């Protein structure tokens, strides 16, 4: 064995390539061994350093792959299993064990994470040259017994099924020991590069090969100073020194310090020596130079997005300076959190990149198909799982419209569970749904699915056949083919990989579970676990790309230019954690009890020395320039600076603050035109009225000049940013169809309120007739109808029974009404709602019990009022009461709190009670002095704060809550005094005032009708204070934003509280000619002062929102 080491300023790969080339020239077969994660990069570098750029006698590979070269022709009839197959073996083993057989792991028998941990431990034991019987001295005897029982059963199953139960290196080891490979190995040379430690399995193999091979050359990085030091704990090179010394002592070899004629980057060499001296507590007569500060830079950026953008700009500048993409390497401290930012921003900057990380297949439609299938069975046909299955794009050739209809109905009827999906759908809403069509669709969707999922427990091979029949029934193969025909080349390759993984898993299921009795649940669980564990194999599309990977796999001299992102304390150094079934203490005790070449790794024990060595490798990763960057905020939380970056700052490396506020008139600050375009657009929405300093003005003048030239060259037109949300006039044909000219316009108090809330909301509801998603479950509308029906029956019962008996009978009869019986017996939630409604009915009914002054004239009175033959006002009055003097009044039942507010009425937002009084006036042909008022009765259980109300006042306060609230005629209040009426001065009106209210209400209807007939519906939700919007903005449709479109909101007229009623009445009394209010983009007749918003007619013509 030959041991070599060199400084990190030297290129060890070049040195070892020369060694390999010299042995190859002597006729030796050379295997250049690198760690698995670095074998591809090592192969590229070795080929670059070979004089002839290629050699048939030199093979760059890894230990396991090298073993295959020697045992490839060795007969091995046993079936090979990958990790998915091993997981199936353990699943099968645990399937036959009961919870009581495993004292520690009994509850985890079917947990996929536990099974994956068993697979990892199985492979780790192979790498440690151990068996499960070596797992002595565990914390619990029961734990040891469980693991021995599981692994012994798995080993028996592997032997019985004639599966290969040994690793590639174990098979190679046996072949070497047998002497079959002596001749081949005698002409073999191993060159080992990139290691600072061997696994126990690799260590034993190297020991065996040392006696058989012609030569083994091992090289690593360390300094002469570090290797010769007496004390290396905490040294920057501790990992490699320990590695070298162990090999030297084992094989009685003196390591040789080697160099090349090429001089490395002096700056990185000097910084390495300075850092080394800080860790070995020595002094060096060197300091950081200006050249060093240019070669190694430390950035601090606000967040990850800005950090990646700064790197992208620097890459674009390097390209402008003549560099190639392949000369640039980007390293990440946290791959997962940076992956999205790197992808989005690099694409914006037109930077091709290769992310050297396997991507999970979990988001592919076929994996979602299998996942949904398993979840449907596990959760008994949960609606969301079934809908995910049918919407995967692989389930049958159903039209998207049919799937949308099915989804809409399932959500409406709240279909859950197998029984409901197998039964005919019967729920309907005003015959809105074509149940025949939906049930036919249900049968096509559910029948093949249930036929498979309802299969009894049987052999795995039989279930596989049924699965194939099911997949053909739902046209999965043809749908996969259809998916690929519309895909890009990259997507086609992914589809091919997913399909190959799927069929491979099915083959392994056939092999392992073919004769095993399986339930559908277990069968699908096995498929799901296998598919979710699969990853795409990624290969760069071209060599000339920016490579992106995690930093802890870095080697010195990886690229000329290196950017390391996310170098915060949490990620640099990266602290390894033990997530296996064996704790660190257990591993330590096991290692103490075993002999040489048999060892379990203890990750936490090597964190410190591994972190130091990775840091030194990172600081020497670039040959020209290295940038280390840290964001202040990473993963939405603040993080501290890494200790290694602090050491660099202590040495004199300056901290460069990078950010978008550093404006400079330089090309590298502009980056490329796509980024500049997005920056200009972002700036366009900022505060442009701020004064810019001279430096910033210079930057933007250069940037805009560059952008204009580029846009003119590429003939790119920037669309105008529209700050208005105006609408276009509805087509006359549509208006004629919805509101025929020969018929009066139909309006109700609710429609009028909607109009004055937001005209566009009226357009959506009453012109387009859009509706919100319905539900079979009762909501506030159903609750209100239920209580209405109860009170109708109570008030209409003229029998001699007591009031309480009448109430209970009315509740019982209402409960038996078919619509309510269906609604309120659907499930426990519905029954609970009915119970609450019954309590509300009993509480509210106390208001009706003792009211001798009032007689119920009639209930549920429908009315149609015709105004000037052009407007037809419709509605239903819940109850009409008559006083002993003959005066009439209106009662409207409400489940929520409503009061008559004259301010809201004036602004068109509370016309209901006045409209009902107008209906009484015209229906009964009476004058205003024959009306006593209109009021709301809140149907509720009073809720009182006991901490603010004493027990002695509790009954009175509860009674006060149950009162009629509305507007009353002052002359009739004497008949109402003592009753349950809220007769405050602010809600009592004399005859003249009531006439004013009634006349003004008609003007509200006429003004609204004029706008509706015009077909111009403005997006004008109302605002009370001009600062916030209270009206319905319908943002998802109109894109109305209060901060940008406040000018288009309708501002309500608000008057001081003192004398408010009289002031509003005075305004209402004025003539329509003297008081006009604009409620749309055109000035229309409307009786309020000028508080509306004018919308420029030209803008309306130019900018349309459909």
UniProtKB/Swiss-Prot annotation:
GO terms for biological process: double-strand break repair via homologous recombination. Its EC number is 3.1.-.-. Belongs to the helicase family. AddB/RexB type 2 subfamily. It is an enzyme of class 3 (hydrolase). Its cofactor is Mg(2+). This is ATP-dependent helicase/deoxyribonuclease subunit B. One of its GO terms (molecular function) is 5'-3' exonuclease activity. The keyword DNA repair applies. Despite having helicase-like domains, this subunit does not have helicase activity. Heterodimer of AddA and RexB. Keywords: ATP-binding, DNA damage, DNA repair, DNA-binding, Exonuclease, Helicase, Hydrolase, Nuclease, Nucleotide-binding. Gene3D superfamilies: 3.90.320.10, P-loop containing nucleotide triphosphate hydrolases (3.40.50.300). The lineage of its organism: Bacteria, Bacillati, Bacillota, Bacilli, Lactobacillales. The heterodimer acts as both an ATP-dependent DNA helicase and an ATP-dependent, dual-direction single-stranded exonuclease. Recognizes the chi site generating a DNA molecule suitable for the initiation of homologous recombination. This subunit has 5' -> 3' nuclease activity but not helicase activity. Pfam families: ADDB_N, PDDEXK_1.
């Amino acid at each position: 064995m030959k041991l070599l080491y060199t400084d990190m300023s030297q290129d060890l790969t070049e040195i070892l390539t020369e060694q390999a080339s010299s042995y190859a020239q002597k006729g030796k077969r050379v295997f250049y061994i690198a760690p698995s994660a670095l074998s591809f990069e090592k192969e590229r570098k070795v080929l670059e350093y070979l004089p002839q750029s290629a050699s048939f006698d030199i093979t760059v590979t890894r230990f396991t792959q090298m073993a295959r070269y020697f045992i490839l022709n060795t007969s091995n009839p046993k079936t090979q299993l990958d990790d998915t197959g091993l997981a199936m073996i353990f699943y099968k083993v645990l399937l036959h064990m009961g919870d009581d057989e495993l004292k520690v792991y009994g509850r985890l028998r079917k947990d996929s994470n536990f099974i994956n941990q068993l697979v990892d431990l199985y492979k780790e034991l192979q790498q440690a040259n151990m068996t499960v019987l070596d797992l002595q001295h565990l914390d619990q005897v029961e734990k040891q017994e469980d693991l021995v029982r599981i692994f012994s059963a798995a080993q028996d199953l592997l032997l019985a099924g004639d599966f290969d139960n040994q690793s590639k290196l174990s098979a190679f080891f046996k072949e070497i020991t047998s002497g079959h490979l002596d001749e081949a190995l005698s002409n073999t040379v191993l060159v080992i590069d990139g290691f600072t430690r061997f696994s126990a399995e690799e260590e034993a193999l190297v020991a065996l090969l040392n006696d058989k091979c012609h030569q083994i050359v091992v090289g690593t990085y360390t300094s002469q100073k570090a290797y010769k030091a007496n004390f290396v704990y905490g040294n920057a090179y501790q990992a490699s020194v320990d590695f070298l010394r162990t090999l030297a002592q084992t094989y009685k070899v003196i390591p040789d310090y080697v160099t090349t004629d090429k001089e490395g980057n002096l700056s990185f060499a000097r910084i390495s020596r300075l850092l080394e001296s800080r860790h070995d507590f020595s002094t060096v007569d060197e300091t950081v130079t200006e050249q060093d500060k240019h070669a190694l830079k430390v950035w601090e950026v606000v967040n990850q997005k800005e950090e990646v953008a700064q790197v992208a700009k620097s890459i674009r500048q390097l390209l402008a300076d003549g560099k190639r993409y392949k000369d640039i390497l980007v390293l990440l401290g946290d791959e997962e959190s940076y992956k999205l930012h790197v992808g989005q921003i690099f694409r914006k900057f037109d930077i091709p990149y290769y992310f050297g990380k396997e991507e999970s297949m979990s988001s592919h439609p076929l994996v979602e198909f299998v996942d949904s299938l398993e979840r449907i069975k596990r959760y008994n046909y949960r609606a969301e799982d079934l809908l995910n299955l049918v919407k995967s794009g692989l389930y049958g050739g159903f039209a998207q419209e049919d799937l949308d209809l099915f989804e809409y109905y399932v959500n409406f009827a709240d279909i859950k569970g197998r029984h409901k999906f197998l039964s005919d759908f019967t729920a309907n809403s005003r015959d809105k749904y074509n149940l025949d069509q939906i049930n036919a669709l249900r049968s096509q969707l559910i029948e093949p699915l249930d036929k498979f999922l309802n299969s009894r427990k049987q052999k795995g091979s039989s279930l596989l056949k049924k699965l194939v029949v099911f997949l053909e029934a739902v046209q999965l193969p043809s749908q996969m083919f259809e998916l690929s025909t519309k895909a890009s080349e990259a997507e086609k390759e992914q589809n091919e990989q997913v399909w190959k993984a799927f069929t491979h898993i099915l083959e392994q299921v056939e092999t392992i579970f073919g004769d095993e009795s399986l339930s559908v649940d277990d069968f699908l669980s096995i498929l799901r676990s296998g598919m979710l564990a699969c990853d795409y194999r990624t290969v760069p599309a071209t060599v000339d790309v920016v490579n992106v990977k995690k930093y802890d796999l870095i080697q010195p001299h990886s690229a000329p230019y290196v950017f390391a992102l996310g170098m915060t304390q949490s990620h640099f150094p990266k602290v390894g954690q033990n997530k296996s079934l064996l704790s660190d203490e257990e591993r330590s005790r096991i290692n103490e009890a075993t002999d040489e070449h048999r060892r379990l790794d203890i990750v936490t024990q090597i964190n410190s020395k591994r972190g130091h060595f990775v840091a030194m490798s990172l600081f020497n990763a670039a040959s020209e320039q290295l940038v280390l960057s840290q964001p202040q905020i990473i993963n939405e939380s603040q993080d501290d600076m890494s200790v290694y970056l602090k050491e660099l700052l202590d040495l004199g490396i300056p901290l460069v603050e990078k950010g978008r506020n550093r404006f400079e008139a330089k090309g590298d600050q502009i980056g490329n035109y796509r980024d500049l375009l997005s920056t200009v657009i972002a700036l366009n929405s900022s505060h442009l009225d701020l004064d810019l300093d001279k430096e910033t003005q210079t930057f933007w003048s250069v940037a805009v000049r560059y952008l204009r030239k580029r846009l003119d060259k590429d003939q790119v037109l920037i669309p105008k940013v529209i700050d208005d949300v105006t609408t276009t006039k509805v087509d006359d044909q549509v208006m004629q169809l919805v509101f025929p000219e020969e018929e009066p316009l139909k309006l109700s108090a609710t429609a009028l309120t909607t109009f004055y809330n937001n005209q566009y909301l009226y357009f959506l509801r009453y012109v387009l007739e859009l509706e919100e998603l319905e539900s079979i479950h009762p909501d506030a509308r159903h609750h209100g109808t239920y209580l209405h029906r109860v009170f109708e029956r109570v008030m209409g019962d003229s029998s001699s029974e007591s009031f309480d008996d009448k109430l209970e009978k009315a509740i019982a009869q209402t409960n038996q009404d078919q619509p309510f019986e269906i609604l309120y017996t659907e499930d426990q939630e519905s029954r609970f709602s009915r119970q609450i409604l019954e309590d509300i009915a009993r509480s509210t009914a106390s208001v009706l019990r003792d009211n001798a002054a009032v007689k119920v004239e009639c209930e549920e009175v429908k009315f149609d009022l015709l105004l000037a033959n052009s407007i037809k006002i419709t509605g239903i009055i819940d109850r009409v009461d008559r006083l002993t003097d003959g005066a009439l009044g209106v009662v409207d039942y409400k489940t929520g709190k409503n009061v008559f507010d004259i301010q809201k009425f004036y602004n068109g937002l509370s016309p209901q009670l006045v409209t009902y009084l107008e209906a009484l006036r015209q229906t009964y042909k009476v004058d205003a002095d024959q009306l006593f008022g209109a009021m709301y009765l809140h149907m509720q259980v009073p809720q009182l704060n006991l901490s603010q109300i004493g027990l002695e006042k509790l009954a009175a306060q509860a009674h006060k809550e149950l009162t009629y609230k509305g507007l009353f005629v002052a002359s009739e209040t004497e008949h109402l005094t003592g009753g349950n009426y809220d007769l405050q001065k602010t809600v009592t009106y004399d005859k003249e005032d009531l006439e004013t209210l009634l006349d003004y209400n008609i003007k509200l209807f006429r003004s609204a009708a004029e706008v509706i007939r015009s077909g111009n519906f403005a997006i004008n939700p109302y605002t009370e204070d001009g600062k916030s919007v209270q009206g319905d903005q319908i943002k998802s449709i109109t894109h109305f934003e209060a901060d940008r479109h406040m000018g288009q909101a309708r501002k309500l007229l608000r008057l001081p509280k003192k004398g408010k009623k009289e002031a509003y009445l005075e305004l209402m009394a004025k003539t329509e000619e003297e008081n006009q209010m604009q409620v749309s983009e055109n000035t229309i007749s409307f009786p309020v002062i000028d508080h509306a918003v004018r919308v420029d007619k030209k803008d309306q013509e130019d900018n349309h929102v459909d």
